Amino acid sequence: VLAYDPQRRGQQREGGPMTVQSKAPAAGGGEPPEGRVGRRAGISAKTLRTDRWWIQPVVTFAVLFSFIIYSTWAAFIDRDYFSEPYISPFYSPCLAIKCGTVPGSKGVPHLGIFGHWWFTSPAIIILIVPLGFRMTCYYYRKAYYRSFWLSPPACAVAEPHAKYTGETRFPLIIQNIHRYFFYLGILLNLILTYDAVIAFRNHHGAWGHAGLGTLVLVLNAVFLWSYTASCHSCRSIIGGRLNHFSKHPVRYWMWGQVSRLNRYHMQIAWISLLWVAFSDVYVRLVASGTITDVRFF
C-alpha cells in the first residue's frame, strides 16, 4: 500500500507525469541489461505449488485407464450380457442377429440390422456413441488432457510440451462434433430408459415385478439423463441464440434449471461413468450364473 504524499503530488504536477520503472532481476541474477526493464524473473522450478497437486491427475488417470481396460474387455468378450429381463447397457440396443446365439444372451431382443455377416461383438457398434459423447465432453477433455497428456497437469504447473496449439488442428479439432454426439446420446438414453422400464418384468415376461437388477438399470438411466442434462452443450442449446430472456420465459426457466445442474457436471460425470460399468458387471454376473438376482416382488 502506498501512502499519500501531497508534496510528491505537487512535484509530479510541476515536473509533469512521474515515470516509475521497476527493474526485475535477470534470469541469471543481478541487474537486467540496459533497455530490458520489467522482465520477469527466470524460475527453473516446475511449479511453486507446495500442495499435493499431482494427486488429482494421478487418480483421474487411474480411474479412466481402468474403465478403458474394463469396457474394452467387456465389449470384445461377446457373452453374458443378457438375463431376462436385464440387458447390459454396453450391448443395448443389440443390432446384430448373432446377439442371441452366444452364451449368456439367449433370448435377447435384437433389431437385426446387422445380419449374420457381422462377425465381431455387437457392442462395438453401440459403444461408438457413448465413447464419442464422453471423449468430446468439455469436462472429460480437461480430465484427460491433464492426466494423460499433462497439458497442463494442474493449475500453475508447467507442462512438458514446447508449444500449444489448442484444438485448432487435427485431430483435436474433431472435438467440435460434441454437440452432434449430444443428440445421439439422447437417443441412446431413451433406449436405456426403455430397458429400465421393461426390467419391471420377471423372467417369464409378466409385468409388476422388480429385482435388484431393476434398481440398477433404473439408476443407470437416471444418472445418464442427469449427465446429459448437465452437459454444457445442453445448457447452450436451451439458452443460446436468445437476445432477450424476457421474451422466452419458458426457455429462461429451463436454462436456469440446467445451469444449476451444470454446477455438478463433474460429479455427475464420474457417477454415471462408474455406474454404467457397475450395471454391466451386475448383468454379467447374473447372466453367467455367478450370482442370483435378488427379487423384491
Where are these regions (language model features)?
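Membrane-embedded alpha-helical bundles that constitute the cytochrome b-like, heme-associated redox core
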Residues: 4-5, 19-297
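Short, Lys/Arg-enriched N-terminal segments with co-localized hydrophobic residues
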Residues: 1-17
